[in-house]
């Protein structure tokens, strides 16, 4: 079997957006990609992110909030920043690491409907990537 590629989702606190992206990534990309997420800082997994993903039958209670791991970052096939802060302060990556920015609003501290909206937007974006490679 061919080695899987690695995708690394990054946001500021590895609390909401990147946690959701990791979960969606495992669902849509898991057969071809190793999927990880991390943050510039560690804020813990937001309970509303867990609740939002449970609504779509994806359990992220065992996911952890992690700081960027240089080993994963430097070996990833694709690094995806999910917020402008992570995009601007993300450590440099080697030239062979493809880095893209997919911006999503931060639902933390906002109404419940924002968690649902951002969850669905991230899921749709990753599904599209799984189908088109873009």
UniProtKB/Swiss-Prot annotation:
It holds the Pfam family LMWPc. One of its GO terms (biological process) is response to arsenic-containing substance. It is found in: Cytoplasm. The active site is at residues 11, 83, 90. SMART domains: LMWPc. Its EC number is 1.20.4.4. InterPro entries: Arsenate_reductase_ArsC, Ptyr_pPase, Ptyr_pPase_sf. Keywords: Arsenical resistance, Cytoplasm, Disulfide bond, Oxidoreductase, Redox-active center. It is an enzyme of class 1 (oxidoreductase). It catalyses: arsenate + [thioredoxin]-dithiol + H(+) = arsenite + [thioredoxin]-disulfide + H2O. Its main location: cytoplasm. One of its GO terms (cellular component) is cytoplasm. One of its GO terms (molecular function) is protein tyrosine phosphatase activity. CDD domains: LMWP_ArsC. Catalyzes the reduction of arsenate [As(V)] to arsenite [As(III)]. Belongs to the low molecular weight phosphotyrosine protein phosphatase family. Thioredoxin-coupled ArsC subfamily. HAMAP family: Arsenate_reduct. This is Arsenate reductase. It comes from Bacillus cereus (strain ZK / E33L).
